[in-house]
């Protein structure tokens, strides 16, 4: 039986485009796969929300993991963006439990982060081979033509966004 670990992922959105990354080819987990910035929720992630607007109802540990991962992977300060108004909204978008194909399964909480404009992002070259802004349909087309590798939860999320970019919470996308 696979161990389940909690994770978070950020779907940064500006108008009809979202930010996706390609993971470095030397990484042990999903090398070369298209994904969203994010990672594991750690025990060290605080269980209180910081002082910033628009955080009501969010899970503190997940939110702090999201902040940490965005800072590590993209040099992006989520709290500063909330405080200065460049981030319009942070909301849970979907939950997905990866299929049991490895020793560890990730239960990923995806968060949509609506931005007023594209931020200046600096990808961590140790983790990220490429950063791109595309529509969900463009990203899915890369997968369909064999130009992109994606784990099932990433595809499920993109399919939901392709159907309705302004959707609220897509709910649990895990296979039933």
Residue ranges and their predicted role:
Residues 2-53:
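N-terminal strand-loop-strand
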Residues 4, 159-176:
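Core RNA-modification/binding signature centered on pseudouridine synthases
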Residues 34, 104, 132:
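Residues that recognize and position ribonucleotide moieties
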């Amino acid at each position: 039986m696979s161990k389940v670990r909690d994770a978070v992922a950020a779907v940064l959105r500006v108008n009809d485009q979202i930010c996706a990354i390609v993971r470095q080819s030397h990484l042990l987990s999903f090398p070369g796969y298209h994904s969203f910035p994010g990672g594991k929720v750690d025990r060290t992630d605080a269980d209180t929300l910081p002082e910033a607007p628009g955080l009501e109802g969010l899970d503190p540990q997940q939110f702090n993991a999201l902040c940490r991962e965005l800072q590590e992977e993209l040099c992006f300060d989520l709290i500063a963006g909330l405080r200065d108004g460049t981030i319009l909204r942070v909301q849970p978008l979907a939950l997905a439990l990866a299929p049991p194909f490895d020793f560890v399964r990730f239960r990923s909480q995806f968060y949509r982060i609506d931005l007023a404009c594209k931020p200046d992002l600096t990808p961590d070259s140790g983790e990220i081979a490429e950063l791109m802004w595309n529509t969900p349909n463009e990203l899915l087309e890369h997968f369909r033509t064999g130009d992109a590798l994606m784990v099932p939860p990433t595809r499920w999320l993109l399919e939901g966004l392709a159907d309705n970019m302004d959707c609220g919470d897509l709910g649990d996308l895990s296979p039933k």
